[in-house]
Curated annotation (Swiss-Prot):
A Gene Ontology term for the protein's cellular component: chloroplast
Highest taxon of source: Eukaryota
Compartments, as annotated in UniProt: Plastid, Chloroplast
Disulphide bridges, residue numbers: none
BP GO annotations: mRNA processing; RNA splicing; tRNA processing
Broad class of where this protein is predominantly found: plastid
Purpose: Usually encoded in the trnK tRNA gene intron. Probably assists in splicing its own and other chloroplast group II introns.
Protein known as: Maturase K
PANTHER family associated with the record: MATURASE K
Keyword Signal applies: no
UniProt cross-references to InterPro entries, sorted A to Z: Domain_X, Maturase_MatK, Maturase_MatK_N
Amino acid sequence: MEKFQGYLEFDGARQQSFLYPLFFREYIYVLAYDHGLNRLNRNRSIFLENADYDKKYSSLIVKRLILRMYEQNRLIIPTKDLNKNLGHTNLFYYQMISVLFAVIVEIPFSLRLGSSVEGKKLKKSSNLQSIHSIFPFLEDKFSHFNYVLDVLIPYPIHLEILVQTLRYRVKDASSLHFFRFCLYEYCNWKNFDSKKKSILNPRFLLFLYNSHVCEYESIFLFLRKRSSHLRSTSYEVFFERILFYGKIQHFLKVFINNFPSILGLFKDPFLHYVRYHGKCILATKDTPLLMNKWKYYFVNLWQCYFFVWFKSQRVNINQLSKDNLKFLGYLSSLRLNPLVDRSQMLENSFLIDNVRIKLDSKIPIYSIIGSLAKNKFCNVLGHPISKATWTDSSDSDILNRFVRICRNISHYYSGSSKKKNLYRIKYILRLCCVKTLARKHKSTVRAFLKRLGSGLLEEFLTGEDQVLSLIFPRSDYASKRLYRVRVWYLDILYLNDLVNHE
C-alpha cells in the first residue's frame, strides 16, 4: 500500500496523467479485490463488496489479462468467435477491467477530497446520510413555496456521451482511449447476447452515472447560484463546455461583454434543488409562467448540450396546494390548517382567522398494495392471501420474516401524517402471516388463532408503537395524538423495497 501511495503522490498539475500505467500493475488488482482502498475512501461503496468478483480473482488470471492488454487486438472479440469460449473469456476480462477502472478513476477524486479537508476540523454526522433527514428540511422550506418542478433525469443513449463527460475530469488520454475501447467491445458482445445480464461492476456503472449527473449539475448549479429566472432567449453559446471553468472565473466580464442579449439572470434566494433516486426537484415561489421557462430550460439543456432526446413530459410542474408530489416513497402536499384566535380589547372582542400552511406527507397506499400484490402478499384489491412459497419453512422462520417486513415498513413510513394507511398495510401482513401458517398446518385461520391465541400478533408491535404508548397516557385524546405523531429516523440509508415498485 505504501508503494501504491507513493506512486500516486503527484503534484496538482499532473495528478491525472498517470492513471493508465496502473492498469498494468498487479498490486492494483489485489487492492481492488481485497478492498485495500479503505484509506483513500473510508466511506467505501457497498457495491464493491461483490462475492462473485472475489471468487473469480486469481493472480494467474491477472497476469494473463495484463499480457492481453499490452496487445489490445487480442481483446477484440471477432464476430465469428462470439459464441465460442474466446468471447466468454474476453468478456470476463472486461468484467475485471470494469472493477479496476472504477477504483482507479476514483483515485484522483479521493486524493483531491482528502487534501481539501486536511487540516480542517469538520464535524462528521452520520445522521445527515439518512433518507429521513431531508424531510424536516422540506417541512421547513416547502411550506413557503408554491410550485415544484419534478424532473426525471435522462440517461445518455450514446456511449460517446459518457466518454466525453469523463474527458473533462480525467486528463489522461490513454486511459480514456482504453476506456472507450473496452466499453464499445463490451457493448458489441452485449448486443449479440441480449439475454445475458450485465456483468459490469455495479460500482463502475454507478460511477458513470454520477459523472453524467455531475456534469449536468455543474452547469445547472452554477446558474442556480447566480440566477433564478431565465428569459426565453437563446443561450447556446454558454454550452461551450471547454471554456466553462474560464467563464466561472471571469463571470462578470463574460456577462458584461458577451451575454447581455443572450442570457438574462435575476437573483432569487427562494430556490431549492434536491436530487434523489434518478430524479430531481426544483422548488420555488415563482409564477406559472416562470416555471414553464425553467421547464423549457431543462429540456433544451439536455437536448442541446447532452444530445439526449428529452421529452417535455419528463418535467412536471406541480402546484403544492393542489397536486401531490411523489418523493422518496411519500406523497407530499401542502395542507391548510385554519386557526381562529380570539382577541379582546377593553369591551370589544375580535376573532382573527389565521391559516397555517404545513407540508403533509402521506403513504401512497395504492402503490404499496400493488407492490405487495406483486410479491404475492395480497391480491390487487388488497385482500391478504397466503404466501405459498414460504410454507416449507419453520414456523419461527415464517413469523420472523413477516415481522421483519412489517417493522421495516413501519420504520420507513413512521413520518406519515396519517397512520391509517400504515395500519392497513400492517393488517395485510399480519393476516397474510396467519393464513400462511394456517395453510402450512392444514387448518383454518379461525381454528389456528384459537389454538395459539392473540399472543402471536403481539410480535408485530414495532419499537415506535411500544415507546410512544409509554410516552402518552392511555386516553382517547392521547390516542388521537399518537395517531398524528410523526417520527423521522436518522438511521435509514436505503429506500424500502416496496418503494421501488413503480
